[in-house]
Amino acid sequence: MKCNKKQEIIGENLMRDKIVLIDGHSILNRAFYGVPDLTNSEGLHTNAVYGFLNIMFKILDEEKPEYLTVTFDVHAPTFRHEMFADYKGTRKPMAEELRQQVPVIKDVLRAMHIEVIEKAGLEADDLLGTLSHRCEEKGMDVSIISGDRDTLQLATEHIKIRIPKTKQGKTEVEDYYAADVQERYGVTPKEFIDVKALMGDTADNIPGVPGV
């Protein structure tokens, strides 16, 4: 999606275009558990869709980007499963009330002419990583909206990670540039990768180094 906003010139410097990248499944999941159950007249659950759109509109109002893209996971094995067969092996199946809302939010986004990207063999955050760095290389400012703190490894001077939290229908957002990651965790974004590798990740069933 390209938003209707003209580039402006301040002094001799051309303002950088801005793109917002949203981790679709991550934000939909957070909205589902953060917003009370809602259904339409046909009995379709809509709380995740409602919460997702609230978060998205809040971010768009704050950021006023020229571009917006939403990435989604594809329900298929990824290259990580080839490297480690038990990857996400202990994760519970997605709640049916949430699953039925995934195609709905995609349809809503496409109806709004918002670009939706998904690719078999890759996860949404893989796409976020590629897109964010390519956009940065083209001189753009990037805001990544995700509930997954693994995305903190992507933070730079021009790539901001925004982690929303929804409680009782209200959304608050934590912002992280590279300097913020260093201040909060005592490591750089690149070093954050090593920390995660050493610690492991119970959510993804990835074992860490014993005793760490």
Language-model regions, residue ranges each:
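A short beta-strand-to-loop transition that corresponds to the Sensor-1 phosphate-sensing loop
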Residues: 24-25, 71-74, 146-149, 165
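Membrane-targeting and insertion segments and their boundary/processing signals
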Residues: 22, 26-30, 72-79, 83, ...
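Extended two-metal-dependent nuclease catalytic cores across DNA- and RNA-processing enzymes
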Residues: 10, 16-17, 36-39, 89-212
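Non-catalytic, usually N-terminal nucleic-acid engagement modules in DNA/RNA processing proteins
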Residues: 10-69, 73, 79-84
